[in-house]
Amino acid sequence: MTATQKHNLFTPEPHYIPGYAGFYPQLRYQVGNTYGRTTAQLLTDPSVQKSPCSVLSPMTKPKFIEDFSKSKPPWIPCRDLREPYIPHYTSLKPYKNFEILGQLPRQDVDTQGPPQVENRQGPLTAGFMPYPPYPACPPGRKGEARDLGHPGLLLAYGEEAWKDAAPLQDTPGKNNQLYHCRRDEYLPPHPPQETLDVGRFQRLPQLDHPNLIQRKAISGYAGFVPRFAWVMGMNYRDGVTQAMDDFDKNQFVFRHPVCALGERLPRTHWPNTTIYRSQGLIPFYMGFIPSMQDNYALTFGNSTRRAYQKELDRRSHTL
């Protein structure tokens, strides 16, 4: 079956909807057609250059290029989402899991011998001490740390903790010496952690044109701003704010003219007098009508006529 053809009275596609206040090229030189037909001719004319980011909806049906036939790997949440700290925070985390910074892991101490001092700094000068002159810890057992709770309590209690501890039981093949952590001993660098991948939060479907969905909306306000002029070097937001402030000041002076005492107010004191008519206003007028809210049991036309009479009485008693 052939598709139904639209009548020539209808506006051809594509065209801009009336009321669009954006920019379109060469419209000022087209005469004799309606707004829709003129924009349709411009959009279909190959000689007119067009922006790749059009505000019109796509003419053709978008194609989904995402392949759903292949099985996807299980989604693994990013580590930054499981941590309570700020994402990408790599500084110090005090008392994290009650670990002492600079202490070798437990499995490394069990399997290896005394940690070799690895100096990663440059050559030391004469008289330089790589670590504070703390006395070396006396020998003890590994189980003493569990007896006293936190491993750092051994150093806090001092000699009494070592004297009260049970005697050593040497085990062949293992070295139970506790070593003091020096500042010139460094742990191996941690493997790089997984960073936050912003792309995994993208929920938009993959189309043949990336910005196809965003093209349906007109970005930015392109309407009329009173007393607004393009000034070189001024931001749009600042220009609109300055224009609206200037407009408010102008309206205040226009509605409150300066006149001497005893003089009659000029006609500009009532700039919106066109809404007051003896015939009354037509229905569905959505503007503001002063003193109309005090009228009851009247139609819209009679209420506006009553407001017109009240306005005449008010002006007659005004200088």
From Swiss-Prot:
- Any idea which UniProt keywords this protein has? Cell projection, Cilium, Cytoplasm, Cytoskeleton, Flagellum
One GO term describing the cellular component: sperm flagellum
Q: Which Pfam families match?
A: CMI2B-like (PF10629)
Stored InterPro entries: CIMIP2A, CMI2A-C-like_dom
Task: Tell me the disulfide pairings in this chain.
Answer: none
Signal peptide start and end residues: none
Q: Does the keyword Iron apply?
A: no
Places the protein is found: Cytoplasm, Cytoskeleton, Flagellum axoneme
List the GO biological process terms: flagellated sperm motility
Its function, per the record, reads: Microtubule inner protein (MIP) part of the dynein-decorated doublet microtubules (DMTs) in flagellum axoneme. Binds to the intra-tubulin interfaces.
Oligomeric state and partners? Microtubule inner protein component of sperm flagellar doublet microtubules.
In the record, the note on similarity to other proteins reads: Belongs to the CIMIP2 family.
User: What protein name does the entry list?
Assistant: Ciliary microtubule inner protein 2A
- Species of origin: Mus musculus
